[in-house]
Amino acid sequence: MEILPKILNNGLRICYIPQSFNNICHVALTIGVGTRNEKKEHNGMAHYIEHTIFKGTKKRKPFHILSRIDSVGGELNAFTTKEETCIYISVHNDYLERAVELLSDLFFNATFPEKEIIKEKEVIKDEIQMYLDTPSEQIYDDFEEIIFKEHPLGLSILGSHKTLDNIKRKDVLNFIKEHYIPSNAVLSASTPSGEIHFNKLAQKYFGKNITNTVNKNTTYKINKSIINKNINRNVVQAHTVIGNFAFARNNSKRTSLVLLNNLLGGPGMNSRLNLNIREKYGFTYQIDSSYQTYTETGIFSIYYSTDFSKKERTEELIYKELNILCKKKLSLNQLNAAKRQFIGQLTLSRENVLNMVLGAGKSVLYKGHVESFSDVIKRIDKISSSEILETANQIFEPKKLSVLNYVKL
C-alpha cells in the first residue's frame, strides 16, 4: 500500500513504516539540502554542518549528545549527499522518545560553538586526505566534477581545505536558517510502538510553530559534452570510469535503466561485466556499474581497476558488452530472468528496516509519498525487451560515453 505522509502545521512531513518483528526502532530526519545548495567558495558546507551539528545544542554539550544514544546501545549517525542531509538513530524501542527528542534538539537548537567547529575542520581535512588515498572512490568525484563543469552537482561533497577555511560561523548560521526548517524536512520512522504513538511524539517535539518556507532547488541547464581525460595520480594500477548522463529521478524511463544496470554490472556475481571480464579472464578484481539519479539528470557509470598492461583489453571487453546490449534485444527468457533476480534482490533488501526508513524519507522529500512494493513490482514487470534495447542505445552508445582515467605520475 502506498504510504502518504502526515504533515504538521509547520510543514514537517511525518512518514511511518510499519513493522512488528523486533524491538528496534529506527528514526531518520531527512533534510532537503546538500552540496548543490552551496556557494562555490563555501563548498563542503552541507557536510561540514553534518559534522558540527553534534557539537552542542542549547541544552547539551558534545559529550552529552554522543552519549545520549550510545549509552543505551544505540547508534546515532548522519550522512550528506549532493541533494540531501540525513541524521538517523537506531535504538531499542524503549528509547524511541529519547531518539525523537534528540533529533528535534539537533534540528532546532544546535549552537555551533566557535571553538568546536574550528576544531572539526581539521577532522574533515583528514577525511579529505583519506578520500584522496582511495582512488576507487575519488575518481567518481573527479568524473562528476568534469562532466558537470560549472553546474552545482559537480561540487565535491567534502569540499577542499581552501573552501573549508573560507567558512565562518556566521556562514553556517545563515545556511542553517535558510535550509534547516520544518517544511524542508521529513521525519520517517519504523517502530513497534505503532503509528499513532510515533505521530504524537513527532507533534510533541517537532510541532514548533515555524512557518518559514524554503526556495526549491534552482534547476540549472546542464551543458552536456563528452570528455576523454587522463589525470596523473600516484597509483599502482589503472582506474577508469566510463559514463554518460542518464534519466533524472522522476523520469518514467528510469526503471528500465535500473534493471539494465543491474543486469550489466549490478551487485550479483552473475552480472555480465563480472562474468565476462573478471570471471572469464581474471583481468580485474573490481568492476561494476552504477546509476545515480538527481533532480534534473542522472549519471550512469562503469568503474574498473586493473593492471596497466590489461587496461586496453579490459576496455575492449566492456565496450563489447555494451555493444551487445545496444544491438541485440533480450530474449523473453533473459528478460524474465533479469526481472526475477532484481525483484528478488529488492525483496531481500526489505529485511533492512533502516534502509527502508531512509529510503522513505528521501521518497517523501522528492515525490510526496512512498510507493507500495506491489506498485514497484508492477513497474518492473511492465518493462519490455524493446524498452531495454531503446534505453541501452540512449545511454550505452560508445560515441556518447565519457571516460576518465587515473594514470601513473
Regions found by a protein language model. Name each.
Residues 15-18, 176-177, 227-231:
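Short, surface-exposed beta-strand/loop micro-motifs that present aromatic residues
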Residues 225-236, 240-243, 252:
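Phosphate/diphosphate-binding glycine-rich loops and adjacent basic-rich segments that engage nucleotide
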Residues 1-24:
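N- or domain-start disorder-to-order transition segments that initiate the globular core
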Residues 7, 64-213, 220, 230, ...:
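Charge-rich, well-structured scaffold segments of protease-associated domains
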